[in-house]
Amino acid sequence: MRALHFGAGNIGRGFIARVLLKSDFNLIFSDVDQNIINAINNYKKYKIKLIDNSFEKIININNISAINSYDPNVLNVISHVDLITTAAGVNALYKIASILIEGIILRINLKCKKPLNIIACENKIKATSFLKKIIFDKIPLKYHDYFDEYIGFVDCTIDTIVPTFSSFKEENSLFVIAENFKEWIVDVNQFKGMVPKIIDMTLSDNLTSFIDRKILTLNTGHAIAAYLGLMKNYKNICEAMSDFSIQRIVKDAMYESGLVLIKRYNFNKKDHLSYIDKIFVRFKNPFILDKLERIARNPLQKLSKDERLIQPFVEAMKYNLPYFNLVKGIAAALHYRNINDIQSIKLSSLIKEEGLEETLVKVCKLNANSNEIRIIISEYHSIIKDFL
């Protein structure tokens, strides 16, 4: 089978390509960075260093090619492939949507009746459905029936860490370091035609529960570790997780959010606690020096109502579950300052100009004078003296 992947960055090279090539796909990368395109087409291979807490190993990625996303020939590629994946960033989906429309219309003109499945592996809940909406808002009505019959828009959740790596050697320009752990869960009901056989891909008929499990465990713990670590001037996740006080808060916060998930989805408690332990061990991986500023960026998004911090805290209060450590993470996020992060600057200005309560109303969509706001404000002031 043939696959086209948009986004030749770390996730594309370190995760998606690894899985698809292992599953015997013929893979073509597409990207707007001509330097990466040239490197892929010149070398046609690269190495991935897989790392775990106790080992590391090198694997080879071979027989790859690439095409610039602005090259008109990409439409011909779209007209012939069986699978399209993306890991290019949410904002890139608007441009990708336009390219896909042209390529799929070419399939229609070629009278292609072969199903095409599209999976957007982006940092957004149900990113593929988001991409589908962009496409359907743009395409003429006369094409809707073809899209409905032959084009599958498959939502997914992915979980792996591929930290940023820079190399000054030309022969290593495609080299990536990737976590050995990987999880790719897709909605089995959204495929068109036969479901492709992809090694290490989990098929689910209840994707929402897996999405929430990841957001309210991995993302919650990751964010809290970052915001607490930055309060103590740590640089990367490994440094932060070497601090016992941060370890305790992060682990207990994931336990608190876990109780919310168990209540919501009736998860098996023993299994979910085992999942938390697995995530916690990954955070302490000494080989992954993921920068805290990267993890903490975009605090306005991370503090929004349905995101990793506010959602479990509000629901824990609703069900009379513990939230002591979750609120510490929220308070630490509100203290986050980074002059290179536009959202951090906006958050800081909002707190300074309109006060903390109004900020929580506007950013987190909490009700004014609510118990949630009262508890967060109290922790915001106490965490400085209690934690540092």
UniProtKB/Swiss-Prot annotation:
GO biological processes: mannitol catabolic process
EC number: 1.1.1.17
Nucleus keyword on record: no
Swiss-Prot/TrEMBL keywords: NAD, Oxidoreductase
Pfam annotation, one family: Mannitol_dh_C
Residues noted as binding NAD(+) in the record, renumbered to the chain: 3-14
UniProt-listed InterPro entries: 6-PGluconate_DH-like_C_sf, 6PGD_dom2, Mannitol_1_phos_5_DH, Mannitol_DH, Mannitol_DH_C, Mannitol_DH_N, NAD(P)-bd_dom_sf
Catalytic reaction annotation: D-mannitol 1-phosphate + NAD(+) = beta-D-fructose 6-phosphate + NADH + H(+)
GO molecular function, one term: mannitol-1-phosphate 5-dehydrogenase activity
Membrane-crossing residue ranges in chain numbering: none
Record-level GO cellular component terms: cytosol
HAMAP family: Mannitol_dehydrog (MF_00196)
Similarity annotation: Belongs to the mannitol dehydrogenase family.
Name of the protein: Mannitol-1-phosphate 5-dehydrogenase
Protein source organism: Buchnera aphidicola subsp. Schizaphis graminum (strain Sg)
Gene name of the record: mtlD
